[in-house]
Amino acid sequence: RMLYAAGGEIGSAILYHAKCICDTIRDEEFVYGHAPINPAFNHDARIISCDRLVDWVLYRAGFTDQPYIHGKCVSGPWLTDWCLEHGFTRIDTVEELLPGDVVFVRPNQNGDPLHTFIYAGKGEEEGMHYRYDAGKNERIRSTQPSCEPLNDFICACRAPSVRPIAVPALSFTYGGTPFDQLEVTAKCEADRVIYTLPDGVELTVVTEFLQDYGVTRWTNHWSNPTDRRSALIENLCDCDLTIPMAPDPARTRRNKQYTWEPKTLRLFISDGANINDHDHTVTPHRMWAGDHKEVCNQAGRSGMGTAPFFEVNEGGDHRNGMLTALGWTGQWRAYFDRGEADFRIRHSLPEVSLRMAPGESFRTASATVMPYREGQVNAHNLWRRFIREAVSPMGRFKGERGTQCPFSAIFWGGIPSDELMERWQGILSHGLDAFDYCWVDAGWYEPLRSTTTATQSADWGNVGTWEVNRFYHPKGYRDVTDFLHERGMKFQLWFEPERMRRSVCEWTDYLWTGSPEDNDVLIDIGKDEVCDQLIERISKVIAEVGVDCYRQDFNFNPLATWNRADRDADPNGERKGATEIHHINNLWRFWDALLERFPHLLIDDCAGGGHRIDIEMLSRSVPLWRSDYQCTWDCCPEVNQNSNMRAAWWYPYSGIGYGPTLGDTYSFRSAYTNGMTVRTWEHADPEWRVGGMNEPFDWAKRYFAEYARLRHYFAEDFYPLIPPSDINTTWVASQYHDRAHDSGLILAFRRAMCPYEQAHVELGGIDRRRNYVFTNQDTGESFTVAGTTLLADGLVLTIPEKRQSLLLTYETV
């Protein structure tokens, strides 16, 4: 008899595996007793008990971080506590039980359970209940589920609504043998499995399941505690995951047309920051059974070329799918394969082919996966909340590093301190007090002496000393930061410590291509002693200057340099990838050290403008200059509209630059995202001083204040009402909704050649029980619409003139 849970996917999975396992233990003549090994890992002994059955069933349902030896015992109450620690809900009455619950009965003298089983539903007779139970030989030999009275009930545990991903979901070859064919031992701890490979090398898979978001994360850590080199590690995929997906629909002519909304599976791949009109574009790729696709980044920078964030959507009604993130700040490659009824995802480090040295240890890429069943928009909003609350340093540290990205005015580092403060006096005297940061970019360090915009723009790349230039800043910038802090503002300072110019300063060990003409070199941060030197060198500047936001650039493509260092280290080619791995590990260690030393510090991840945006960097920083496209003078507003909407699909926190020209509301609002820096007074020449461009200060006061007041919404839930487009004859519109306060904004643009005065949109996040008052931020006019009306009819937006914007805020009444 087969029973399924009426309301839960995981409950159904638990019942399915319970039935299969109970049939197996009956047919293979298992006996009751204490198994020497958790049968979820190895059941060759054919010994089973009540708790080992539950262990085995839960493992098959995806709860894999279990002890290898013996398993979780029911007494103690070890199994009960384990369930609650893993997001199960405690059930305290028999009347509340649902099929798939783990039931605990027969209390001992301490009140702890002595017996457990899988509940399978109420029986036909009063007081009788179905169960899967291996508590004695008679039950093991029977056909289950059995129907028995439920006596001495203590409690039950119900699995969370989102199934965890079964890990370890990784693959590699070791000495030519695939991981799943190696003779290994496994030791399970609370959040990790430690595998000991045949030669003593240890692989530790650390896992985390975040129930609030349905996210599973894991990282793989390698250690060679032996006195000899390891076998060759190759074909390393830190994520190798196959997930069930519905079979393809029939291959009809219509389903092959790209103008038709397909019911086929789609893989969504995002562009990185490539300094062009298409930055962060998300492109769907239809994949039929047998199709294969692979993508990679460029030149060793994780967000250059292709971004390491992916989505697979099942097809059909498009409600089911999975979001994934590859956590590696170096070179990566991703492979995707469509099966008949499944989909395989692999995240690899393609450069790795190495033997570990004695005593060597490192970690490789992390994997983050989030299955979803409520559609793409809901999934990406849950992802945004996950990044905002559980990943980003702003969310994780509960506001110690701020709660929003900065609103800044940017200045070149060669503007003398006295003049910089004079410019700020001018900015503030015109009522432009919405800024919360002064952003100082390149050019503030020794040995520079240039005094014009042209020469400073040419000389800034002479880096390496990381000493404040006393020619420009006699007091070492401390007078500037004191000035700012007294006025409630903060100070952001640019660095590029991984690159060093040999003609300037050879302050530490470095790597290079070997060419005498190669003046820019890569410091050898992969060496622990170099990393330690860097931590001290940069920490000294942060402390002495009073830096609030540390901005790290990286104008260097490191892959070729890493590969040369690997060849130099081992001409036999058995250390490929080692230099890169240690560089990335110590880059993370460097940032972690700064965050630990300076609890207030925010880190800005630049890397040539968005070239290293990955989930590992997002866990330590925010990208405040998302693309060097913003280096373009008064860059195209439509590109900013598109870029902001495309990036919002994955990142709640990010920023771009604007300007220098002020006065165009359409263009300025096109730059609205969670962080912005204004370029109007950026450079050294006199025309860049406050008032030098005849700035419209009244306009600036109004719209700077508008942006600062509404900025927080751009980190909330995002709804693409009219998707981004590369044509100029359309509208684009987005909604940002604050779930906690049931308020938000709608930002819409009618482009320059668009003939339509009105657009009809369907809003997200609306509560049918509430009424919403909308306010036009240009006219001040308000109107009220019932939630039921908004959900039934949507909302009509009106922009009377071409190349104009509409900004509506709303709240409940």
For the regions a language model picked out, list residue spans one by one.
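Polysaccharide-binding surfaces and accessory modules of carbohydrate-active proteins
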Residues: 164-340, 350-352, 771-784
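Short Pro-Gly-centered flexible turn/kink motifs
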Residues: 354-373, 803-811
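Active-site-proximal substrate-binding groove within the catalytic cores of carbohydrate-active enzymes
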Residues: 168, 174-180, 186, 587-782, ...
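Glycine-rich, aromatic-flanked loop segments that form ligand/cofactor-binding clefts
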Residues: 168-180, 308-327, 372-388, 392-393, ...
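C-terminal beta-strand-rich structural cap/linker in extracellular carbohydrate-active enzymes
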Residues: 786-813
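...with weaker cross-activation on analogous glycine-rich loops/strands in unrelated enzymes
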Residues: 8, 12-15, 63-142
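N-terminal capping segments
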Residues: 1-68, 112
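Aromatic-lined carbohydrate-binding/catalytic grooves of carbohydrate-active enzymes
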Residues: 402-536, 545, 549, 559-561, ...
